């Protein structure tokens, strides 16, 4: 688990220069766990709108919440660890408690950890996710991620495990992936094949890095939502790192991104309505109400409501809970079951990037904070995308999984668009002027993206070159050379 591809030198400098403190409790309930909002009964539709609107914050209270996932593997045979056993995922979670993490159990099994507003949770096949606390700066984000990776490395080494940051599992088949013992996932596992061909791959063989960002007003939310949706394909291209399936090139640079196009059309996509006149909280609530349910959580039990209507739930007509009305916790849970390229809960979640090494786990939040948390940068980003047609937005979304930076666009390529977006983000971070103790601002965290743009080589293309060259077609090399 050497951080050879992750930049230990920058990590060490960040640790030395930035006193790590969590600014506030995380606002991000883990995807894999029920939310913890009040069990207030919903008796009026306005409560649904008010719940989202309650996320509005003054600029001084804006925070950054970064999440990332990674693949575990056994060092001896590279197979993903199961949940059980001396070298299993539960053993890893229990080992991490030595660092002050509190265990979270489901039916007597440790399935998550919490500490100071952050959480460590499990994706369906045991992908390990850190949902970071809500912090003020990218410096703090990067130290948080680095500290987590260091803790995981210490325990994983003892268990002879390693971890890999990529967008898609490069070696193992879907039927070779383990399943975690979590009620929510069993419901999704049964439902996914009914609505798409690749949903089970999404659950078991993908990893991402995401950032959650705040808005001040409804108008601010709308502008940020539109900019981030239009530029999400640019992030997909820059972070493209999933070119292998079952040991061979799959024809994509971000196969993870492609998978979302055949997972579940009812809850994925580019949300064209966000660009329509009059878009706001009300319209987003209408969209979420039309997303079929997965479950309702009551007294420690996940009740299978897959395919059911939340609108019927509001009328007390949910057949698995007859006569019961939903609570705000049900609404909070339901908001997490939509998977568009950008998602709104009480904040906006950027969902377009593949997982990757440590430096790109810092670059992803830096990219979006630079674009969205500075007024001049947000204006410039909006000027860049405001005349994109619906057809162009979809062409970008559909084309970047395969072609990434080399996708033709308006007489140039997505690389040109990415160069301009990164330039805007750099300016935004410089004007934010959030300095570490050495007086360095956050713009340096975009160095990884500058290198990708200038080289015109995505992480996927780099790995493909190695695969066809130095590795001589041996996919096992990716585990040794790109592990954390």
Q: Could you tell me what each predicted segment is?
A:
Residues 1-19:
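N-terminal chloroplast transit peptides
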Residues 157-158, 162-343:
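Loop-rich catalytic cores of soluble enzymes, especially ATP-dependent carboxylate-amine ligases
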Residues 11, 20-33:
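Short, positively charged and aromatic/hydrophobic N-terminal segments
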Residues 71, 210-214, 349-351:
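Structured core elements
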């Amino acid at each position: 688990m050497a951080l050879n591809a992750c930049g230990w030198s920058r990590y060490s400098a960040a640790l030395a220069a930035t006193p790590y403190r969590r600014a506030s409790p995380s606002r991000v309930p883990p995807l894999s766990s029920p939310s913890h909002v009040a069990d207030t009964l919903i008796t009026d539709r306005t409560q649904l709108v008010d719940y989202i609107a309650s996320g509005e914050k003054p600029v001084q209270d804006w925070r950054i919440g970064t999440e990332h996932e990674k693949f575990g593997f056994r060092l001896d045979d590279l197979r993903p660890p199961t949940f059980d056993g001396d070298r299993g995922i539960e053993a890893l979670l229990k080992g991490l408690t030595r660092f002050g993490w509190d265990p979270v159990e489901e039916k007597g099994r440790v399935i998550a950890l919490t500490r100071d507003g952050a959480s460590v949770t499990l994706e369906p096949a045991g992908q390990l996710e850190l949902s970071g606390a809500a912090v003020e700066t990218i410096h703090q984000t990067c130290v948080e991620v680095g500290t987590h990776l260091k803790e995981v490395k210490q325990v994983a080494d003892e268990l002879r495990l390693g971890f890999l940051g990529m967008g898609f599992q490069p070696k193992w088949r879907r039927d070779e992936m383990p399943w975690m013992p979590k009620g929510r996932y069993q419901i999704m596992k049964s439902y996914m094949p009914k609505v798409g061909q690749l949903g089970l791959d999404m659950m078991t063989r993908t990893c991402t890095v995401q950032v959650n960002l705040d808005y001040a007003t409804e108008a601010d939310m709308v502008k940020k939502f539109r900019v981030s949706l239009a530029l999400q394909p640019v992030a997909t291209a820059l972070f493209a790192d999933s070119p292998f399936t079952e040991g061979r090139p799959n024809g994509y640079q971000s196969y993870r991104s492609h998978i979302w196009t055949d997972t579940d059309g009812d809850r994925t996509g580019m949300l064209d309505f966000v660009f329509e006149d009059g878009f706001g909280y009300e319209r987003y609530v209408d969209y979420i109400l039309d997303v079929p349910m997965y479950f309702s959580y009551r007294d420690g039990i996940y009740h299978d409501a897959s395919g059911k209507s939340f609108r019927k739930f509001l009328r007390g007509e949910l057949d698995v809970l007859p006569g019961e009305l939903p609570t705000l916790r049900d609404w909070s849970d339901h908001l997490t079951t939509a998977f568009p390229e950008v998602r709104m809960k009480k904040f906006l979640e950027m969902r377009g990037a593949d997982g990757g090494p440590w430096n790109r786990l810092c670059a992803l939040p830096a990219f979006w904070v630079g674009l969205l948390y500075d007024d001049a940068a947000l204006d410039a980003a909006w000027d860049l995308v405001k005349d994109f047609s619906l057809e162009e937005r979809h062409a970008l979304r559909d084309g970047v999984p395969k072609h990434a930076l080399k996708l033709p666009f308006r007489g140039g390529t997505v690389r040109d668009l990415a160069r301009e977006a990164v330039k805007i983000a750099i300016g935004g971070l410089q004007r934010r002027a959030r300095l570490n103790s050495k007086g360095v601002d956050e713009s340096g965290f975009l160095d990884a993206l500058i290198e990708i743009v200038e080289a015109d080589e995505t992480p996927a293309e780099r790995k493909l070159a190695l695969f066809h060259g130095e590795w001589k077609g041996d996919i096992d090399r990716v585990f040794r050379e790109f592990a954390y």
